[in-house]
UniProtKB/Swiss-Prot annotation:
Source organism per UniProt: Lemna minor (Common duckweed)
Main location: plastid
Lineage: Eukaryota, Viridiplantae, Streptophyta, Embryophyta, Tracheophyta
Name used for this protein in its record: DNA-directed RNA polymerase subunit beta'
HAMAP family cross-referenced by the UniProt entry: RNApol_bact_RpoC1
Gene designation per UniProt: rpoC1
Reactions performed catalytically: RNA(n) + a ribonucleoside 5'-triphosphate = RNA(n+1) + diphosphate
Length: 690
């Protein structure tokens, strides 16, 4: 691999990959290599693969050993063998066939290129929505497509020179369209001279317009127009207002695209190809199966189609002098369509098929989707220190915790447990430690608990479409074989508990653990990175639970028309369905929330049973209230009780407030205590941070 490619991969000692347009010089630098005799190879000029008699790669073909390296390590096309890396004065390549004596693995990354006879537009940047080329040129996509596929031409502005196109105004009528009539007047060379002088068509016209763009001027002009449209305000016409909004959205996209090109040092004309890269042979193999038959990648056939058409166009432009110009335009269109099919088959309509009516897999089909090169081969590989299981709800977990089954945890942290067993002199070597783990001795689980306390794990749910698709958690040992997850983090993962699976990974290096703790913990990712809205919000089951918890008894206070102090409530008598009808009117009173929760745990009251709870309420709130009591009950000792809708006041003979009771339920008490603990915990954390 050449030094330029190495510098891209190994920059700053980190492996990185950037996908985007590249210059023709960069493509040439990736593909070209200089042999020890000074010859430069890298261009693929022939559409052949292997010779049908010798089964050897054709020279300058799609599997040429001079361009891509030897098929067998250290063996050239002639059959000579040299020891790889031997420091001798012998040349490192065969002087007869020009093949270098290198490792055959070079065929996995050594690229080639096809020198196109005419510029070709990259179909990804033309046809994919939004069209980058149409955005930058500010022209309709249909107009650009007609220009690319030679359906019409642009006239070049030539000042103070007689032009053939000015004759168009001399005719009163036209028998044919000028698109078809102009090429009929010229031979090949004459048409090329005319086209280069007066008209512009094909991808070359797109390339010229992109090369003339100034991205900074585009950004400034788009911003000025956007501000002018914003200052105009509403016109009162719904159709016109919609057109203005669409235009403003287009200007924003255009500015963002231009800024991205400036930031990444990409020139707009690179979206039009002059050199077509050829993939390494090992990525598009030809395999021989039983019976001597060959199986080839579809990309090889698409490359052959491009080379055939490109060579035909080259012959028309260089050798033939009497070919009509119309034929040249038609051949350029065929080259453009062949490259489109190679890059993205079917993007322009009907896909290309083979003799068995099977659609060819283009480059886009190979890399995109769930079974593509990235998601299946590169990102979907199994890795060490990872596991996978179904997720279930863990309502008792904290937001930053996850429940890890014992079977998964002991496998993930086995090396750490072995080290702990040896350090504590429980086992003398690795073999004994593994046997203790297999026997599941109690000391194993104790050491596993210690290891897991300071080691976060990463949970990932595919597809990982944004950064919240993988988050860090503190693992907790649980029984069973399913991973327990807090329900509040499901929205970030786009997960639910209907059979979804998640993968668990163990960060090993200190850098990875620090990143997990500082950036990836679930309780530190409460907001959506896209729009900033809260993403850890109660949904579905949690909302239903909160509703049931706080619904209370709908009968209201008017159902109780007696002094609650006269009700004798046996604290030890459990409440069942049989005697509930007889006792449900008796609303008990409690001096603290702990007593109320204790009575609920003893099944003395229900979750929604109304009760009176003594409460420390600011008397100024009571005095300032203008609410009239629903009922006043007097005691024999002179004290009396003012019963309001939601609270009750006990006053002395001197009308002083002795105590205040509020009417609530166990559900409200539980909910209040949870909120109170959360606020206090937040306050303590904030005070500690300050």
């Amino acid at each position: 691999m050449n030094q330029n490619f190495y510098s891209m991969i190994d920059r700053y000692k980190h492996q990185q990959l950037r996908i985007g347009p590249v210059s023709p010089q960069q493509i040439s630098a990736w593909a070209n290599k200089i042999l020890p005799n000074g010859e430069v190879v890298g261009e693929v000029t022939k559409p052949y693969t292997f010779h049908y008699k010798t089964n050897k790669p054709e020279k300058d073909g799609l599997f040429c050993e001079r361009i891509f390296g030897p098929i067998k390590s250290g063996i050239c096309a002639c059959g000579n063998y040299r020891v790889i890396g031997a420091e001798k004065e012998d040349p490192k390549f065969c002087e007869q066939c020009g093949v270098e004596f290198v490792d055959s693995r070079v065929r996995r990354y050594q690229m080639g290129y096809i020198k196109l006879a005419c510029p070709v537009t990259h179909v990804w940047y033309l046809k994919r929505l939004p069209s980058y080329i149409a955005n930058l040129l500010d022209k309709p996509l249909k107009e650009l497509e007609g220009l690319v596929y030679c359906d019409f031409s642009f006239a070049r502005p030539i000042a103070k020179k007689p032009t053939f196109l000015r004759l168009r105004g001399s005719f009163e009528y036209e028998i044919q369209s000028w698109k078809y009539s102009i090429p009929l007047f010229f031979t090949t060379q004459g048409f090329e001279t005319f086209r280069n002088r007066e008209i512009s068509t094909g991808a070359g016209a797109i390339r010229e317009q992109l090369a003339d763009l100034d991205l900074r001027i585009i950004t400034d002009n788009s911003l000025i127009e956007w501000k002018e449209l914003g200052d105009e305000g509403s016109t009162g016409n719904e159709w016109e207002d919609r057109k203005i909004r669409r235009r403003k959205d287009f200007l924003v996209r255009r500015m963002e695209l231009a800024k991205h090109f400036i930031r990444t040092n990409v020139e707009p004309e690179w979206m039009v190809l002059c050199l077509l890269p050829v993939l390494p042979p090992e990525l598009r193999p030809i395999i021989q199966i039983d019976g001597g038959k060959l199986m080839s990648s579809d990309i090889n056939e698409l490359y052959r189609r491009v080379i055939y058409r490109n060579n035909t166009l080259t012959d028309l432009l260089t050798t033939s002098r009497s070919t009509p110009g119309e034929l040249v335009m038609c051949q350029e269109k065929l080259v453009q369509e062949a490259v489109d099919t190679l890059l993205d088959n079917g993007i322009r309509g009907q896909p290309m098929r083979d003799g068995h009516n099977k659609v060819y897999k283009s480059f886009s089909d190979v890399i995109e989707g769930k079974e593509g090169r990235f998601r299946e081969t590169l990102l979907g590989k199994r890795v060490d220190y990872s596991g996978r299981s179904v997720i279930v709800v863990g309502p008792s977990l904290s937001l930053h915790q996850c429940g890890l089954p014992r079977e998964i945890a002991i496998e993930l942290f086995q090396t750490f447990v072995i080290r702990g067993l040896i350090r504590q002199h429980v086992a003398s070597n690795i073999g004994i430690a593994k046997s203790k783990i297999r026997e599941k001795e109690p000391i194993v689980w104790e050491i596993l608990q210690e290891v897991m306390q300071g080691h976060p794990v990463l949970l990932n749910r595919a597809p990982t479409l944004h950064r919240l698709g993988i988050q860090a958690f503190q693992p907790i040992l649980v029984e069973g074989r399913a991973i327990c997850l807090h329900p509040l983090v499901c929205k970030g993962f786009n997960a639910d508990f209907d059979g979804d699976q998640m993968a668990v990974h163990v960060p090993l290096s200190l850098e990875a653990q620090a990143e997990a703790r500082l950036l990836m913990f679930s309780h530190m990712n409460l907001l959506s990175p896209a729009i900033g809205d809260p993403i850890s919000v109660p949904t579905q089951d949690m909302l239903i639970g909160l509703y049931v918890l706080t619904i209370g008894n709908p009968r209201g206070i008017c159902a109780n028309r007696y002094n609650f102090f006269n009700c004798k409530n046996d604290e030890n008598a459990p409440l069942d369905n049989d005697n509930y009808q007889a006792t449900k009117e008796k609303e008990p009173h409690f001096s603290s929330s702990y007593d109320a929760l204790g009575a609920y745990r003893r099944k003395r009251i229900r979750l929604d049973s109304p009760l009176w709870l003594r409460w420390r309420l600011d008397q100024r709130v009571i005095i300032g209230s203008r609410e009239v009591p629903l009922e006043v009950q007097y005691e024999s000792f002179g004290t009396y009780h003012e019963i309001y809708r939601h609270y009750l006041i006990v006053r002395s003979v001197k009308k002083e407030i002795c105590s205040i009771y509020i009417r609530t339920t166990v559900g409200h008490i539980s909910f209040y205590r949870e909120i109170e603990e959360a606020i206090q915990g937040f306050y303590r954390a904030y005070s500690y941070a300050s």
